[in-house]
Amino acid sequence: VGFKAGVKDYKLTYYTPEYETKDTDILAAFRVTPQPGVPPEEAGAAVAAESSTGTWTTVWTDGLTSLDRYKGRCYHIEPVAGEENQYIAYVAYPLDLFEEGSVTNMFTSIVGNVFGFKALRALRLEDLRVPTSYIKTFQGPPHGIQVERDKLNKYGRPLLGCTIKPKLGLSAKNYGRAVYECLRGGLDFTKDDENVNSQPFMRWRDRFLFCAEAIYKAQAETGEIKGHYLNATAGTCEEMIKRAVCARELGAPIVMHDYLTGGFTANTTLAHYCRDNGLLLHIHRAMHAVIDRQKNHGMHFRVLAKALRLSGGDHIHAGTVVGKLEGEREITLGFVDLLRDDFVEKDRSRGIYFTQDWVSLPGVLPVASGGIHVWHMPALTEIFGDDSVLQFGGGTLGHPWGNAPGAVANRVALEACVQARNEGRDLAREGNEIIREASKWSPELAAACEVWKAIKFEFPAMDTL
């Protein structure tokens, strides 16, 4: 019989429209833009091949393995509505292609070399269905939403945070002072900026010590549990763990990691340490837009969010929705549900291509941050619900009277919105009124309302959904 050398079309082996997917398969939805003259079936099959067992030519060693058992299969292709020459190619991967408990290995296969493939003009991974059998090989978030609430003793409302600004240049002592002011005023958390690691103007240990002092002082004064996301991100995993150990020894409740710049291997390492040592883990998504911003190439953020839930994190930044378009609201809420819920149904209108069952893997709190202030509070409370962290950087520190009054303004606004919602009022319609009413009793809130009043509150249109 021998082996037949030469190049043959991918679609002869890797395009299998009759294939019925298995419960154990990892399923991927790719947005494929083929080069002119390349049929969509060939492009979809090429993606399946190059991200699994295939190479550009038939090789002698193919005969030593069972391709049927190990190959990725393109099992369905559909054109993208409203786009010329774009297709969604669905690919199924057998579970045995992946190392257990390794997001790194999963991504190396699925979004590895295939993205540089010449027969495609562009390629984007839109969604991933992770089978329950693979999920069970991951630890996931160190603690999850319920355990975090129990640790903090805070229920029935979103949590409030604030990123300390200016992000670079403060000394450790002044940094700790800013942390203390915010926490004393009523915030639950303050946050290291993602690019604060250990620079000449503020070495990490000095920052950790002053922030710990700020936390304890604020806790003593307010009777509430407080936290500061101590950024443990470092140049090596060893250094990162050293910083996490120091945070634990200081009694800090939470550390932070930049999971995309740090990498999934480092992130999973830190997540395991955090669970073993009772630390919460806040995740920042710096660099995500490099990967997810192009509509036709890269990877959608919902895939990065799913990967983070597997790798491990208790909070992750997830956009704000406010003031953006309605489609974005639906799509953002789609991946917010993928982060928090145990079971999410397929829903293409929200960008969810597959039904995802998380089999009791703990959930992740979505963090809304970036350009938000007190007037956005009703919208944020309505959109994100209780299980979220609302982070106001400039919206706290930009208060004309200083950090603590800025924190007071945000806390009063939040409590007013939660109370109004619990009384059955419609936050979408009455949001402005609720904030105005509350500001009569809080001079701090009134001052904040005055500063940011020019920034429009674009919310009523949301009712049309």
Swiss-Prot record:
GO terms classed as biological process: photorespiration; reductive pentose-phosphate cycle
Enzyme class: lyase
Modification sites for N6,N6,N6-trimethyllysine: 4
Swiss-Prot/TrEMBL keywords: Calvin cycle, Carbon dioxide fixation, Chloroplast, Disulfide bond, Lyase, Magnesium, Metal-binding, Methylation, Monooxygenase, Oxidoreductase, Photorespiration, Photosynthesis, Plastid
Keyword Disulfide bond: yes
Subcellular location: Plastid, Chloroplast
Catalytic activity: 2 (2R)-3-phosphoglycerate + 2 H(+) = D-ribulose 1,5-bisphosphate + CO2 + H2O; D-ribulose 1,5-bisphosphate + O2 = 2-phosphoglycolate + (2R)-3-phosphoglycerate + 2 H(+)
Binding site for Mg(2+): 191, 193-194
Active-site residues annotated for this sequence: 165 (proton acceptor), 284 (proton acceptor)
Enzyme Commission code: 4.1.1.39
Gene Ontology CC, one term: chloroplast
Coiled-coil features, chain-numbered ranges: none
Gene Ontology terms for molecular function: magnesium ion binding; monooxygenase activity; ribulose-bisphosphate carboxylase activity
Positions that bind substrate: 113, 163, 167, 285, 317, 369
Family named by the database record: Belongs to the RuBisCO large chain family. Type I subfamily.
Something else known: The basic functional RuBisCO is composed of a large chain homodimer in a 'head-to-tail' conformation. In form I RuBisCO this homodimer is arranged in a barrel-like tetramer with the small subunits forming a tetrameric 'cap' on each end of the 'barrel'.
Entry function: RuBisCO catalyzes two reactions: the carboxylation of D-ribulose 1,5-bisphosphate, the primary event in carbon dioxide fixation, as well as the oxidative fragmentation of the pentose substrate in the photorespiration process. Both reactions occur simultaneously and in competition at the same active site.
Annotated protein name in UniProt: Ribulose bisphosphate carboxylase large chain
Organism of origin: Clitoria ternatea
Origin organism lineage: Eukaryota, Viridiplantae, Streptophyta, Embryophyta, Tracheophyta
